[in-house]
Design a protein with these regions (language model features):
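Ubiquitin-like/PB1-type beta-grasp interaction modules and other compact soluble beta-rich domains
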Residues: 1-154
Length: 154
């Protein structure tokens, strides 16, 4: 299954989980491209689909409408002095730099966050792929990146 999630923003799942077909020799950016466009989203990235792919933002008019960062996450962000700045939140895209300096998109496969770029992963039948928005380097989605603690899994 495949999902795109923004629960750290109080927005729940933007997509899915949905069943997705995976094709031989197709890397994850191509799957992401198909799913996002199918559900009416566009996106920005750096690198290329085949090398150094980094998902910078997912875009659609009103994507952040009604967002509300859970109070527990705000408290943790205040503790690390990365206070959410509403001026950095666009109504039309969600990505790196939204609200905090540590925000961006991460992905996990079968419950494990991947340390390599999406372009290096070839999805297989049965995979559970989650593309998730984090406000602080993954700490709010259950990933202790760069030696940081994890705050829970929103």
């Amino acid at each position: 299954t495949f999902s795109v999630e923004a629960s750290t923003m109080g927005l729940g799942n933007l997509i899915g989980p949905v069943n997705v077909s995976y094709y031989d020799e197709e890397t994850l950016p191509y799957v992401l491209n198909r799913v996002l466009y199918q559900y009416g989203y566009t996106y920005h990235y750096s690198g290329s689909m085949d090398s150094g792919f980094y998902l910078k933002s997912i875009d659609r008019a009103g994507i952040t409408d009604g967002y509300h960062v859970p109070d527990a996450i705000v408290s943790h962000l205040e503790d690390v002095n990365d206070i959410p700045d509403p001026d950095t939140c666009s109504a039309d895209w969600l990505g790196e730099g939204t609200l905090t300096g540590g925000s961006g998109w991460m992905y996990s496969v079968n419950g494990t966050y991947m340390s390599s770029g999406m372009n290096t992963y070839f999805p297989a039948d049965g995979d559970v792929i989650r593309v998730r928005f984090t406000l602080y380097y993954g700490a709010d989605i259950g990933e202790a990146m760069q030696g940081r603690e994890t705050w829970g899994d929103w």
